[in-house]
C-alpha cells in the first residue's frame, strides 16, 4: 500500500495550484494524499466550484475515492485508482476556468490506456487563468517537443461572470518523453495583437489596438466580434513569436476601466518579458515543471520565478523522485532537473 502524502494548502502561493498539481501527480503515481488549509491564502478559502469540478473530474477519470469533496471544504483526502482513457464531459456551473480543470486531468491521460477527449464548460476568459489560445499556441507546441500530443479547441467563449464557455482537448498516451531545452528567446520574428469583443463596442477594441501599436511594431492587428450571448466581455492579447519560442500575453477588460488602461497593463507585462533574454515567461514556467519532471530531464530559463512556479516544484518533488535546481545569473534564472 502506497504511503499517504500530507500537504499543507497554505504553502507557497496558498491558492489552488497546490491542489491541482497534487491531483495530477496522485493520478499519475497512484499515491494518495491529504491536503489541509485548502486555498488558505485567498479571501474566500476552501473549494470553489472550479476546484470542486477538478476534484470530481480527477476522481471520475481514475476511479478515486474522495473525502471532503464539497463546496467550501478546506480538507480533502484523495485515494486514486487506475486512470482510464475515454470521453469525458465536466461542467463547472460558474465562470470558473475551463483550462485549469483541463490542466488538472490531462497529465494523467498521458498515461491512459488509450486516446481521450475531455470537454469542460465554464469560463474561458478569466484574468487568473491561461486562456485556451495560450494552451493551443504556446504550451502545446512545447509539449509536442517533449513527446506529449494533445490538441485543444475553444468551442465557445464564456466571459466572467456569466460563463457558458466550452473548451475541449483531445489527447493521446505518451509513447516516450523527450528532453526540453529552452534557453534564450532569440530575435523577435513578429508580434501579433488581438482583441476579442462580445457585446462591447468595436471602438473599445480600436483604442486597445492603438495603444499596443503605440508601443510595439505589430505585424498583425486582429479584432474579433463574438456573438453577444457569449459576453459581455473583452480580452486583449499580444503574441510574441521569437526564433526559439512563441509566447502569448493577455489581459481581460473590466467595467469602468478605460480601453487605454487595459491595454497599457498588457504593454507593461510584455515589456517586462522582453527586458530579459530568457525564453520562458512567468506563467508558462508554471506549466513546464510537471512535463519536464516526467521526462526526468530538461531545463529552461525564466526572468522572474513566480511563487506559483516554486510551489509547483515543491509539490512535484513530493510525488516524483526528481530534484529541481534554480540558479540565478544576471537577472535570469535557470530551472533544471538536477
UniProtKB/Swiss-Prot annotation:
User: SUPFAM superfamilies annotated for this entry?
Assistant: EPT/RTPC-like, RNA 3'-terminal phosphate cyclase, RPTC, insert domain
A Pfam family of the record is: RTC_insert
Q: Which PROSITE patterns match?
A: RTC
One GO molecular function term of this record is: RNA-3'-phosphate cyclase activity
Q: What is its main location?
A: cytoplasm
Keyword Kinase carried by entry: no
Q: Where in the cell is it found?
A: Cytoplasm
Gene symbol here is rtcA
Q: Which keywords accompany this UniProt record?
A: ATP-binding, Cytoplasm, Ligase, Nucleotide-binding
Where would one find coiled-coil regions in this protein? Answer: none
Give the top-level enzyme category.
ligase
The annotated active site, in chain numbering, is 308
Q: Which GO terms describe its biological process?
A: RNA processing
What does the entry list as the binding residues for ATP? 103, 283-287
Instruction: State the superkingdom.
Output: Bacteria
Q: What is this protein called?
A: RNA 3'-terminal phosphate cyclase
The reply to whether Cytoplasm figures as a keyword in the UniProt entry is yes
Q: What is its EC number?
A: 6.5.1.4
| Its job | Catalyzes the conversion of 3'-phosphate to a 2',3'-cyclic phosphodiester at the end of RNA. The mechanism of action of the enzyme occurs in 3 steps: (A) adenylation of the enzyme by ATP; (B) transfer of adenylate to an RNA-N3'P to produce RNA-N3'PP5'A; (C) and attack of the adjacent 2'-hydroxyl on the 3'-phosphorus in the diester linkage to produce the cyclic end product. The biological role of this enzyme is unknown but it is likely to function in some aspects of cellular RNA processing.
Q: Name one GO cellular component term.
A: cytoplasm
- InterPro entries tied to this protein: RNA3'-term_phos_cycl_insert (IPR013791), RNA3'_phos_cyclase_dom (IPR023797), RNA3'_phos_cyclase_dom_sf (IPR037136), RNA3'_term_phos_cyc (IPR000228), RNA3'_term_phos_cyc_type_1 (IPR017770), RNA3'_term_phos_cycl-like_CS (IPR020719), RNA3'P_cycl/enolpyr_Trfase_a/b (IPR013792), RPTC_insert (IPR036553)
Which family does this protein fall into? Belongs to the RNA 3'-terminal cyclase family. Type 1 subfamily.
Write out the catalysed reaction. a 3'-end 3'-phospho-ribonucleotide-RNA + ATP = a 3'-end 2',3'-cyclophospho-ribonucleotide-RNA + AMP + diphosphate
Amino acid at each position: 500500500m502506497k504511503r499517504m502524502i500530507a500537504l499543507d494548502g497554505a504553502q507557497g502561493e496558498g491558492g489552488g495550484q497546490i491542489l491541482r498539481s497534487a491531483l495530477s501527480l496522485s493520478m499519475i503515481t497512484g499515491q494518495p494524499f491529504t491536503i489541509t488549509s485548502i486555498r488558505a491564502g485567498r479571501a474566500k478559502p476552501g473549494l470553489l466550484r472550479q476546484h470542486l469540478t477538478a476534484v470530481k473530474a480527477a476522481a471520475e477519470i481514475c476511479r478515486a475515492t474522495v473525502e471532503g469533496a464539497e463546496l467550501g471544504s478546506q480538507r480533502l483526502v484523495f485515494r486514486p485508482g487506475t486512470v482510464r482513457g475515454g470521453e469525458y464531459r465536466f461542467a463547472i456551473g460558474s465562470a470558473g476556468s475551463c483550462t485549469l480543470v483541463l490542466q488538472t486531468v490531462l497529465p494523467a491521460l498521458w498515461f491512459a490506456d488509450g486516446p481521450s477527449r475531455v470537454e469542460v464548460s465554464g469560463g474561458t476568459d478569466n484574468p487568473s487563468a491561461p486562456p485556451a489560445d495560450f494552451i493551443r499556441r504556446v504550451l502545446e507546441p512545447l509539449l509536442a517537443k517533449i513527446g506529449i500530443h494533445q490538441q485543444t479547441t475553444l468551442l465557445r467563449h464564456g466571459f466572467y461572470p456569466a460563463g457558458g464557455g466550452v473548451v475541449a482537448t483531445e489527447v493521446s498516451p505518451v509513447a516516450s518523453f523527450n528532453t526540453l531545452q529552452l534557453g534564450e528567446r532569440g530575435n523577435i520574428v513578429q508580434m501579433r495583437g488581438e482583441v476579442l469583443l462580445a457585446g462591447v463596442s468595436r471602438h473599445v477594441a480600436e483604442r486597445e489596438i492603438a495603444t499596443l501599436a503605440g508601443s510595439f511594431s505589430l505585424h498583425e492587428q486582429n479584432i474579433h466580434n463574438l456573438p453577444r450571448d457569449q459576453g459581455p466581455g473583452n480580452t486583449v492579447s499580444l503574441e510574441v513569436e521569437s526564433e526559439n519560442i512563441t509566447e502569448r500575453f493577455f489581459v481581460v477588460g473590466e467595467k469602468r476601466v478605460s480601453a487605454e488602461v487595459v491595454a497599457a497593463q498588457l504593454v507593461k507585462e510584455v515589456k517586462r518579458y522582453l527586458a530579459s533574454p530568457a525564453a520562458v515567461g512567468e506563467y508558462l514556467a508554471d506549466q513546464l515543471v510537471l512535463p519536464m519532471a516526467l521526462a526526468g530531464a530538461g531545463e529552461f530559463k525564466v526572468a522572474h520565478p513566480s511563487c506559483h512556479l516554486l510551489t509547483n516544484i515543491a509539490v512535484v518533488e513530493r510525488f516524483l523522485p526528481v530534484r529541481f535546481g534554480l540558479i540565478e545569473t544576471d537577472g535570469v534564472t535557470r530551472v533544471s532537473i538536477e
